[in-house]
Amino acid sequence: MRDGGVTIQILVVTLLHPLPRNGSRGVFVEDHIHLLRSMGHDVRVVNPLPRMPRFAEARRSTMMGVAKAPKRWMKDGAEVLSPRFFALPDHPYPRLTKWSIGRQAKTIERQLDSWRPEVILCHTLWPVAELAQNLAARWKIPWVGIVHGYDFDVALEQKSLSKHVAELSRRCDALVCASSRLSSIASKLEPSPKKLLTIPCMTEIGKEWRREVKPLSKSWKKEAIDILFPTDPRRPEKRHLLALQTGEEMEQRGWIVGITTLRHQPRNIVFDRMLVADVTLVTSKREAGPLVARESLLCGTPVVSVDVGEVKDYLPEEWVTKATPTALADGIEHALYHGWKDEISVEEKLAFSNREQVTEAWSALLSDLVS
């Protein structure tokens, strides 16, 4: 909200967003939209989707529900626009994809009727930032690119996409990265972004799920433990096999182990699973957060993780290990035996991503852009 309490009209253009058949898709973007609306802003959402046959959804869990998603639908009392664009797997023809998505600007302008934003926020640069850029140019307003991981960890490393991602990073009026690691990558781009900030995804769970992280209350190696693998095992970058190998290592040490995975569950079910789990195991190759690690800690479940994202900033050093079954098993045993022993509480460690801090950061940026 502007100084003086004036509502800002914001258009969110995002590659990921919940769909009618996939409510867990892009929940971190949905959290941001809810935050902006709670700040009093008028927010509209455009979620461009690639054209694809139903069978192609099996390639990635994030594609579930995309093929038959409606082009216009209601979410939380507000309309979501989902124009289609052409894209092939791994984007061998990026210029064709840019042209396909960029030409949707006129359609979006017509669908919004007389409503016009004062700023555009674009979650994930490739390829939807091309649409954000075209709309911003038509309306002569600023736009903000928001990087969560894919753009720099995957697209920037692909020969066919790297120059396009770098160009989009430069063209936006401000580039927001979800972690300091991503901001460090952005700062080394040539030319560098006009304005670079680090604003994490907000971490917030209801009081009914909040617990303290305590040592294991079960009998040591006599009762079964539940290890939570907090994502869809079909996503290769999450390394489900490493989690299974870690479970086998624990069993060789005398533990009775069960591993629970999460597939497209709504948020309240995810938090319930975190409450009943004895430990959360993160084995991802790439993460901006990961958000699930912070949420798990707030639910009272210890988190053992490979060194990914920002976990070193708040997890005990014994809980951040090498990406081997033995090291991860050592971390799990330490977490189960000791619980949270840091003098600084979990809430204080995660204060950088709480509602107040994230609200303040976005309020300052938006006020600066539209003033």
Label each region the model flagged:
Residues 293, 302-305:
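Short hydrophobic beta-strand element within catalytic cores of glycosyltransferases
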